Amino acid sequence: MTMRHCWTAGPSSWWVLLLYVHVILARATSAPQTTATVLTGSSKDPCSSWSPAVPTKQYPALDVIWPEKEVPLNGTLTLSCTACSRFPYFSILYWLGNGSFIEHLPGRLKEGHTSREHRNTSTWLHRALVLEELSPTLRSTNFSCLFVDPGQVAQYHIILAQLWDGLKTAPSPSQETLSSHSPVSRSAGPGVA
């Protein structure tokens, strides 16, 4: 009697594959150091502009929320990232700092868990980044909220030092979106309403 072994991909295997594909895509493109506007405390509502007629133009939508007032050194700070996906079970939302995983950064900071909220034809993903003790190094770190699903990859960059310096100068924000349907598509981030 001959025994055959048939390998089937479990759910954890897909996450590893999806993360691997993301890392390849993220390293293949340059990530500009950009900031987001502090006047509203948020970039935009990630799911409000989605249209089923043109999903590749609007997905993924990504939003980052930060404190409107500068947090003093050694203070606690929470950044919140929200993404909207049409792939409820095949999407990842996570934070990076200077291109590295949060666990590799110096200082007291941690990622929250990813929560998922299913709404009609979309799924909202939420994930917080908590800086328990803001240091000069963390203040100058390029934090990136990354969102990956089978259709696209999106990154939102925020540097706290530039963000708070922007209270005086109001810089224009930007959001980088990489689509699997086009080589590199970049769109300007939300403006001040």
Curated annotation (Swiss-Prot):
Disulfide bond as UniProt keyword: yes
Subcellular location(s) of the protein: Secreted
Positions bearing carbohydrate: 74, 98, 120, 142
The entry's keywords: Disulfide bond, Glycoprotein, Immunoglobulin domain, Secreted, Signal
A Pfam family the protein falls into: YLDV-IL18BP-like
Disulfide bond annotation, renumbered to this chain: 81-145
Protein name (record): Interleukin-18-binding protein
Encoding gene per record: Il18bp
